[in-house]
Regions:
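Conserved catalytic cores of phosphodiester-cleaving nucleases, focusing on short active-site segments
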Residues: 47-53
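Non-catalytic C-terminal interaction segments of nucleic acid-processing enzymes
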Residues: 1-45, 56-186
């Protein structure tokens, strides 16, 4: 069975204060990323994962909401965009209750954000599971993107800014992948 890890190095944003530790054999690099905390080398404009702790996520619904929403709509421009909250939904709701934030508001906001932007929100049980989930997300995003490149006759190592005419075809493929939906105005 083939290994389910990406072939490109995983890029960890330099602002990430408590980065995930990936298993041996997975190459990583640290550098600044425009959107998200994790991506793949060369695919910054294709895939991103934003990592949040329970308290971070609760803050995003409250006092940091406008900043997070701006960031979320930037993520939504990518074909593969994800937010991984490092706890189960139950643990997130329990933490929310302890802070005085309305649980229904938190859950409703996350659902509304996902529906409005198409960004996937994940709630794995813990940090270890979150790390494993991130590896799988990056692997499958890379695989799907490489298939799209192959469909338009572009090699996976061709820098996107040098692609030329196939860029239009890739854009159409991304729109098709998203179901042709357009995002609401910002």
């Amino acid at each position: 069975m083939a290994s389910l890890v990406p072939t490109r190095p995983i890029v960890i944003d330099t602002r990430e204060q408590t980065p995930w530790t990936f298993p041996d054999g997975i190459k990583t690099v640290r550098r600044g990323i425009h959107f998200g905390d994790y991506t793949l080398d060369g695919l910054d404009e294709i895939v991103a994962i934003e990592r949040k702790s329970a308290m971070d996520m609760i803050g995003c619904v409250g006092q940091s909401r406008s900043r997070f929403e701006k960031h979320l709509y930037g993520l939504a421009d990518l074909p593969f965009a994800h937010v991984i909250i490092e706890c189960s939904m139950r643990a997130l709701c329990e933490t929310c209750s302890k802070t005085g934030v309305n649980v229904s508001s938190l859950v409703g906001t996350i659902i509304a954000w996902q529906a409005a932007t198409g960004v996937h929100f994940w709630t794995p049980d813990d940090r270890r599971f979150a790390t494993a989930l991130a590896v799988r997300i990056l692997f499958h995003s890379e695989k799907k993107w490489d298939q799209k490149l192959a469909q338009v006759g572009v090699g996976q190592n061709t820098p996107l800014h040098l692609v030329g005419e196939p860029t239009r075809l890739l854009s159409e493929a991304v729109d098709e992948y998203r179901g042709g939906s357009t995002l609401p105005p910002r």
